Amino acid sequence: MTRLSVNVNKIATLRNARGGNVPDVLRVALDCERFGAQGITVHPRPDERHIRRSDVYDLKKALTTEFNIEGNPDERFIRLIEEIRPEQVTMVPDAPDVLTSNAGWDVARNYDHLCRLVEQFHAWGIRTSIFIDTDLDNISWAAKTGTDRIELYTEPYAAAYHKDMAAAVQPYVKASAHAHSLGLGINAGHDLNLDNLRYFAERLPYLDEVSIGHALIADALYLGLEETIRQYRDQLAL
């Protein structure tokens, strides 16, 4: 069964908009676990516009499910990973000023850099994942780095879903089958929601994990957090 990791960045964004500690990121993350989330994801950025370094330390002390930290692996990020030692690190090539992650790695162009990162994170006992698009050659290059997993960037799927869902998912079906044949685990994330998640998961039998934040938190405004997580888990219970 595909695991659900809840990205709590949006909770931090809401807190930071007003100051103080409401909503409490740690409490929400622990409630997510209690309500059935199988992991917690954060994406700390240098300007701390949502998740702060202090949040990452607090979460590490308290979480009982898998902790996934994603981000651009600059020196500051690498030091944070060394100190926290999460279960998984997802390497994302986003610039500091982007609103949200909007592209995967060109692995061939960054091959040596990614190889060094994978080797270092493995030395610290951390599972690695490379954020990537569906290009098959790019996935082959990712496998050569020694990474454990890839995370498929799913915004193109979500954007095209209502136009032609079969065509939208097909590149991901091919990509996941290719990755699986190379021994890679497969994660996915970006704009997955209650509308498009089940169809996606049904067609990717090797899908290990999805990380979902924005849509899940938006749904929770109407449904409540516990019911929302239950519904997302239900979409993945294939």
Swiss-Prot record:
One of its GO terms (molecular function) is pyridoxine 5'-phosphate synthase activity. The active site is at residues 43, 70, 190. Pathway: Cofactor biosynthesis; pyridoxine 5'-phosphate biosynthesis; pyridoxine 5'-phosphate from D-erythrose 4-phosphate: step 5/5. 1-deoxy-D-xylulose 5-phosphate binds at residues 45, 50, 100. SUPFAM superfamilies: Pyridoxine 5'-phosphate synthase. CDD domains: PNPsynthase. It holds the Pfam family PdxJ. One of its GO terms (biological process) is pyridoxine biosynthetic process. It is an enzyme of class 2 (transferase). One of its GO terms (cellular component) is cytosol. It catalyses: 3-amino-2-oxopropyl phosphate + 1-deoxy-D-xylulose 5-phosphate = pyridoxine 5'-phosphate + phosphate + 2 H2O + H(+). It is found in: Cytoplasm. InterPro entries: Aldolase_TIM, PyrdxlP_synth_PdxJ, Pyridoxine-5'_phos_synth. The record marks 151 as: Transition state stabilizer. It comes from the Bacteria. 3-amino-2-oxopropyl phosphate binds at residues 7, 18, 191, 213-214. PANTHER family: PYRIDOXINE 5'-PHOSPHATE SYNTHASE. Catalyzes the complicated ring closure reaction between the two acyclic compounds 1-deoxy-D-xylulose-5-phosphate (DXP) and 3-amino-2-oxopropyl phosphate (1-amino-acetone-3-phosphate or AAP) to form pyridoxine 5'-phosphate (PNP) and inorganic phosphate. Homooctamer; tetramer of dimers. Belongs to the PNP synthase family. This is Pyridoxine 5'-phosphate synthase.
